Curated annotation (Swiss-Prot):
This is MICOS complex subunit MIC60. Its main location: mitochondrion. The gene is MIC60. Component of the MICOS complex, a large protein complex of the mitochondrial inner membrane that plays crucial roles in the maintenance of crista junctions, inner membrane architecture, and formation of contact sites to the outer membrane. Plays a role in keeping cristae membranes connected to the inner boundary membrane. Also promotes protein import via the mitochondrial intermembrane space assembly (MIA) pathway. Residues 1-31 form a transit peptide.
């Protein structure tokens, strides 16, 4: 139906087509899926013409345009009635009707989406058809429709081709040269499409004046029919009387030996095609020879100019590229050298700054240490001087008093109390001897305290258990006559000072490993078997681990409290907590408790020795 309506409307738009045909020749449209404005479609593209194949270029006789048919034939073809197909089948004359079944279910209502899609499809098809029709009428809308609407260019090209075939009924339309699939693209710099120019011009006056019905030709229908009949009679008479044959001067084809450019080759091919067409026309009488000779000479000159320009441009471009390459290499070398110098200078600057900063920090710390040492020495010296000064003042006063008393006594007794003086001297000697014993006792106490601190320091600073037999022997030698110190040393387990005791950090690390094993056996009874061990191991994985000073006597609470006490440094309380375990938990922690016991024994002995030394110093005072 759409094609029929377009065919009926085509006679009305033919005057517009004649007016807009020059515009179509200027605007080079290409019929393809992707439209490129810089390319032009050419039917049956000719191969590239080379100088060797220029002389062989010919046009087959089937491609030479033939004269159009007589006006009567064209008019008859245009005035042929169009048979419209039946759109609806005839209905029968019967009037019988059948009542609907009362039990028939109600038809289901169709969805809105289906109806929407149906009407949307119909409206889209109608809009697309209207766009195609209006594109055949308006040039501006034609450009818009073919460029922005999908497949619009193909649809418009199809109807334009049908209309053109209807106006120009050539027998050569079946040639594969003008098939749409043989259209190729050519750049906009090439010459306007010669093949399309041929079939645009070929419709003659007879076709243009064929029986079209328009508003500007209705009044002169009879006159045009008479003129068409007279023209047909004249054509028949001319065809009946053949003209005498005249000798035909064939033109030579154009041969350009240096035509390496594709555009020049296309121009050569076009000129050769024109020469072939002229040679096929027997009535040219050599009137195109001068124009073609001039065109050949001009084309040769243009080709030589193009080759010369190409050579000059190639030479200039090579020189520019070479100079640019040299400049780039020179700039790159300078840049590399400059970067090397900058990096070396930066590295030297950083080294110098690093050395200066290191020296400054070292000097600063040395000055600070020196100032602190000097301040401490000054304080100590001043304190010592003050004490010595006080003692000297006290001794001077006491000596002055004693001298005064003795002088007075001598004055009073006139050397009568020499016995008292001698007794005083004996008492002074005795007091001096007693003070010597006190000083010796203080030195012994200090040595004992230093030895105890040495043992404690050796035990606290060790990373792994080490024997401390040497320190203990020195302590025993210093306190050889003290029974309390000897008893305290004898109470230490020999394995403790021969193998060493672990530090608090090692005890905590050992406790964490023991705690993991104790948790696995937390749920075991005393007479547990293999199954009980496996069950306890499985249940220990799902038990919640307590933390902090947990309340309770269960294994998890005891382990949590022990860990907190160990972190606080209370080893005695931690050992007491672990000693309160029962069953397999106590058995597994037995070795750890033994180590804790040895550590506590050593600590207790050292505390007793330190207390004894402190007590001796107090008794001496």
């Amino acid at each position: 139906m759409l094609r029929a309506s377009i065919l009926r409307a085509s006679p009305a738009v033919r005057p517009l087509a004649r007016q807009t045909r020059p515009q179509w020749r200027v605007v080079q449209r290409c019929y393809a899926d992707n439209k490129n404005l810089g390319e032009t479609a050419v039917p049956n593209p000719a191969p590239t013409v080379t100088p060797s194949s220029t002389e062989k270029a010919t046009i087959p006789s089937s491609d030479i345009p033939k004269p159009p048919p007589a006006p009567e034939t064209a008019g008859a073809s245009r005035s042929a009635p169009t048979i419209q197909p039946a759109t609806t089948p005839p209905t029968g004359p019967g009037s019988a009707s059948i009542a609907p079944d009362p039990k028939q279910p109600k038809p289901k209502k169709k969805g809105r989406i289906r109806r929407l899609l149906f009407w949307l499809t119909i409206l889209s098809g109608l809009g697309y058809a209207g766009g195609v029709w209006y594109s055949l009428v308006s040039d501006n809308f034609h450009d818009f429709f073919t460029e922005y609407v999908p497949y619009g260019e193909d649809a418009v090209a199809y109807f334009e081709e049908r209309e053109f075939r209807k106006r120009v009924p050539w027998p050569c339309w079946d040639s594969p040269r003008l098939q749409p699939q043989n259209l190729v693209r050519r750049t906009s710099s090439s010459i306007l499409r010669p093949q399309w120019a041929e079939w645009r011009v070929l419709p003659t006056r007879a076709t243009a004046t064929s029986g079209t019905k328009g508003p500007h030709t209705i009044a002169n229908v009879q006159e045009k029919k008479q003129e068409a009949a007279q023209t047909a009679t004249v054509v028949k008479e001319e065809a009946a009387a053949p003209a005498p044959a005249k000798p035909v001067n064939h033109l030579d084809h154009l041969a350009v030996p240096d035509a390496n450019d594709a555009v020049v080759q296309d121009v050569v091919k076009i000129v050769n095609d024109i020469i072939t067409v002229i040679n096929a026309d027997s009535a040219h009488d050599g009137k195109y020879n001068s124009a073609l000779d001039k065109a050949k000479s001009e084309l040769g000159r243009v080709v030589s100019d193009i080759n010369l320009m190409k050579a000059n441009l190639r030479k200039e471009s090579e020189e520019k590229v070479k100079s640019a390459h040299d400049e780039f290499e020179q700039a790159a070398k300078e840049l590399v050298q400059r970067l090397d110098h900058q990096m070396q200078a930066q590295e030297a600057h950083w080294k110098e700054e690093f050395e200066n900063e290191r020296e400054r920090l070292s000097q600063t710390y040395k000055d600070r240490l020196r100032s602190e040492l000097e301040a401490a020495e000054k304080v100590y010296e001043q304190k010592t001087k003050n004490e010595l000064l006080q003692q000297s003042i006290h001794l001077q006063k006491s000596f002055t008093a004693s001298v005064r008393e003795r002088v007075e006594a001598e004055r009073d007794g006139r050397l009568g109390k020499l016995n008292e003086l001698s007794s005083s001297v004996h008492e002074l000697e005795k007091l001096t001897a007693e003070w010597n014993s006190v000083v010796d006792a203080n030195l012994k106490t200090q040595h004992l305290v230093v030895a105890v601190e040495a043992v404690k320091s050796a035990l606290e600073t060790q990373a792994t258990p080490k024997p401390f037999v040497t320190e203990l022997a020195a302590l025993k030698e210093i306190a050889a006559d003290d029974p309390v110190v000897s008893a305290a040393i004898a109470s230490i387990n020999p394995a403790a000072y021969q193998r060493g005791i672990p530090s608090p950090a090692l005890l905590i690390d050992r406790f964490r490993r023991v705690a993991a094993e104790v948790r696995k056996a937390a749920l075991l009874p005393e007479d547990a078997g293999v199954a009980s061990h496996i069950a306890s191991l499985a249940m220990s994985k799902v038990l919640f681990k307590k933390s902090g000073l947990a309340v309770g006597q269960d294994v998890e609470a005891v382990l949590a409290r022990t860990e907190v006490l160990l972190e606080e440094g209370d080893l005695d309380a931690a050992a007491r907590e672990m000693n309160g375990l029962q069953g397999w938990a106590k058995v597994l922690s037995k070795d750890w408790l033994g180590e804790c016991r040895r550590v506590l024994e050593v600590r207790q002995a050292l505390d007793v020795i330190a207390t004894e030394a402190r007590l001796n110093s107090l008794l001496v005072d």
